Amino acid sequence: IYQFSDNFMTLFRTELENYLVEQGFSKDNITIVDGANDQATQTGQIDNFISEGVDVLIVNPVNSSSAATITDKVVAADIPLVYINREPDAEEEQRWEDNGWNVTYVGCDARQSGTFQGEMIVDLGLDTVDLNGDGKIQYVMVEGDPENVDAQYRTEYSVKALTDAGLEVECLSDQVGNWQQDQAQQIVANALGQYGDKVEVVFCNNDAMALGALQAIQSAGRTVGTD
């Protein structure tokens, strides 16, 4: 797991372990380690697992861009590899298919997630969202991690849903919150302090950052969906 302190991944690893036990795996044969949000640490952990001769590796990469390096190590050891939650890029996935490797990715479609975010704004209608009446939707974007493919897709497709619907948009601020609630809270608080009532929409790449944004909005005396 890329980082144990991530609330979502805490739930994920708990459910994953429970499911494996339900399927008949011995808990003693399941080892889950904390990558501590450091790719070098995680790569070392993977090297250790390979040396120990594990039967399968499930990897939630710290950096999706490191997938090729991880894949090469694991494939060379002839160990099945499953990536979860953080999707490697399309070129890397195509490499698995071209070579017939026992490697796959399991996770949600981040393009769809981003589109759903944007469509929620579209469904509200311009009259509701365009609080300052200038005919544009001004937004603040809080990204999880610019190197993470899921973050890239959610960022791109949330805004694309607005422009595809014919809405004019203006990005007031695009900052990295590293998936963390406290960082997102500070980013949104700063944006509200700088842009005030001009901020009409806040997009966040995950739930934790959305909660941080909510706290900042409430602290600024504004109400989500109203002002």
Spell out what each predicted region is.
Residues I1-D227:
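A residue-level marker of the well-folded mature domains of exported/periplasmic proteins
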